């Protein structure tokens, strides 16, 4: 009984820790600063997604990048400083 209770408690704490640690990641949003034309050049597609976008942005000297679909970005790869 003690092992089962300990296991359930550990599992509950593990799930709780995972939920809390993802909270800030899900709430964050990338907002480009400066001119959008300078930081949102490449169009995103099924073959050019967040991974390739972030890689290309880092190669261009930015810290990261992501495909943004909302207006005014229009499904473009936007880099962040």
UniProtKB/Swiss-Prot annotation:
Biological process, per Gene Ontology: defense response to fungus; killing of cells of another organism
One Gene Ontology term, aspect cellular component: extracellular region
Leader sequence residues: 1-27
Cystine residue pairs: 40-79, 44-67, 53-77, 57-78
Keywords: Antimicrobial, Disulfide bond, Fungicide, Plant defense, Secreted, Signal
InterPro entries: Defensin-like_dom
Subcellular location as annotated: Secreted
Family: Belongs to the DEFL family.
Record's protein name: Defensin-like protein 43
Lineage: Eukaryota, Viridiplantae, Streptophyta, Embryophyta, Tracheophyta
